[in-house]
Amino acid sequence: VDDPPTRSPIAREAAERRAHLEGGRPQTVDRDVALGRAGFADDSAPPDALVAVLDTEGGWVVGESRADARREAGTVQGRRSTAPVRWPVEMPAVPGDAARTLQTTWVEPAYLEPDASWCAPGGEPASPLGNGGAFGGKERSPVAAAARRLADRYDRPVRAVLSREDTVRLGPKRPPVAGWVRADESGLLTVAAPQTTDDRSILRASIAAVAPDFEVRFVPVVGPPSASTVRAAGWAEAAVLVASCRPPEAPVVAPNGAAATAAIRDEGGREVVSVWVRCGTSLDDTVLRSYCAGAAHMALGWVRSESLVVDDGGVPLDLTIRSFGVLRAVDMPQVEVTIAPDGGPPINGSDAVFAAVAAAAWRATGFAPRWPAGERVTVGG
């Protein structure tokens, strides 16, 4: 494996291009990332910048430091809930010839860096996407507009930052679904309706790309916002249903044409996930493999353990990273990634891997009708 600092400029450009394709936003691939200098938006803010945080009513409170602003806003540390998981989309009528059914619940994207931006008076705000797009979780973040507005108001640089609790309450989720599929790959997918018609159109088109014989219905659901921007939203669920009617070695083909397979096996008491991916020219095998491994981690948690509990008003009750059921590193299987030779144009491959691993993980449960299919992970408050 090449050490990033030894890459030639051409090799580094190729690595960053692959990372851009997988993450959806420009990425930095070099030693600085490992040293904590990844280029996140908040890293470049002036040290004397004011700090703005949200109060309990959703208004911005400004202070000389983050601690001052949080104190003024009355911010309370989030906790996890003991409430049971709910499946918000009711299962539609299931015909007698249906082969499989599936219901999913709310899950939290749980991206590493909460939304942040900063802006000087009269300037352009730093992008909250920073060194990555949080797989669609930050596409509509409010922090850049807030930083610009507050910098002009106070005539000083302002950092606008969301807490982890804010990202959970405000950030978009993948829409929960309920649906079924027949052996001939026709089916029905009922999707929690996102807020915009554009999102609904995008979801409908992406689902049709992988499951052309599916009917898609949108239903209103009380809950946090959902969006088509979240990784493989809608089409991954449809692809998983379709894959359940095919041989396990059949590839999952994403709307962009990337293909992937996944298999889960026991090897001396240790779980191993084998992934095969075809996504055009690799550009950088190390970067591509790392994104595929990350996609496998995300998929396994989605199927087995992740959920986000909301109250009757749709407000999330789980407000800490540990409460989301994200698969712990100690519980992560070994992931083997085979990259298929392909001289075609490079395209995103990890989203296809995400869907393929989810399909394999679901198969391993015996096609449990609800996700999360395993016991919910609880590792503290």
What residues fall within each predicted segment?
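Flexible, low-hydrophobicity surface segments
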Residues: 1-91, 143, 156, 172-173
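Glycine/serine-rich anion-binding loops at beta->alpha junctions
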Residues: 127-140
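C-terminal catalytic domains of large/alpha subunits in multi-subunit enzymes
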Residues: 1-15, 19-22, 80-87, 94-97, ...
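A glycine- and small-aliphatic-rich helix-loop capping segment at beta-alpha/alpha-beta transitions
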Residues: 140-151
